[in-house]
Amino acid sequence: EDWSDFYFLGGTTIIDAAVFWKRNGYIRRSLMCLSFQFQKHLSLGRGGMILTDDKEARDELKKMSYDGRDPDIPWRDQNISTIGYHYYMTPETASLGLEKLPKAIKTEPRVWDIEEWPDLRDMDVFK
């Protein structure tokens, strides 16, 4: 199946939108994965974000990005029950993103060709 800008992973609500850039482009009731890798429209060198309108998913993803910890509870007071990945964006990278955002909004995004980017659905880890 060909795709343009984004695609859903299998029968899930997870969207690979790594090359997608569009005002008000969020698709409701999804986990929309964005990339800020150096080739992307909002180029921060690395990192990304997952957009969601599901509060429960947001809370779980936030914990996962902080090594499975709740960022609002002191480390010593927690009994971790969630797998964590240490994937939070540093304040410096977030600040750079805010600096670059006005220009990114005004700039026409690159149109990616399907052959330029791997389709995650073809990778064993997602099968």
Spans of features found by a protein language model:
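Conserved PLP phosphate-binding loop immediately N-terminal to the Schiff-base lysine helix
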Residues: E1-S35
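Active-site region of PLP-dependent enzymes
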Residues: W21-K127
